[in-house]
């Protein structure tokens, strides 16, 4: 079942934790690619100095952050790596959750091809398929074309995992500082990164 619009409403930190264990789905050329979310980071503009929307900055890139929750915010870093975020909080409150890592589930062959241009890969390469925000976007075929897309769409959405299949019983959720935000002054220390401790696809222990 797709996560309903109400899933994305409310406190961004709580939404971030709720996203863990759910499945991010992208349909590419009719083929489902997906992964279980195992690591996220929350960004709470306009007060969070790590957020693109800090200080209420509105640009063509960040405009989607000010819109309705439950939409995709995709941007480029270093001019080449895409990052996928879920917009949260009410309209006008620019907050979101970065999906940092997935455990691949559906479309594994397509994911391998997207990452390595081959399907015969090593165990080490398999562990690197989706253990980072840029890697997972490449694996699932998420690009700037998906910026602003509603997560109620048929082709891009969060699929709720049934309780009996949810991996939360196997892993403890750990909170810690976010990664690669050296510019963010005191916000460097906010414990707004949430991940499944010990999961092999987490990007950084």
Curated annotation (Swiss-Prot):
Q: What is its EC number?
A: 3.2.2.-
Q: What class of enzyme is it?
A: hydrolase
Tell me the InterPro entries matching this sequence: Formyl_transferase-like_C_sf, MPG, MPG_sf
Sorted alphabetically, the keyword list is: DNA damage, DNA repair, Hydrolase
Q: Which Gene3D superfamilies match?
A: Methylpurine-DNA glycosylase (MPG)
Q: Which Pfam families does the protein's record reference?
A: Pur_DNA_glyco (PF02245)
What processes does the entry annotate via GO biological process terms?
A: base-excision repair
Which molecular function GO terms apply here? Answer: alkylbase DNA N-glycosylase activity; DNA binding
- What family, per the record? Belongs to the DNA glycosylase MPG family.
Q: What is this protein called?
A: Putative 3-methyladenine DNA glycosylase
Species: Bacillus cereus (strain AH187)
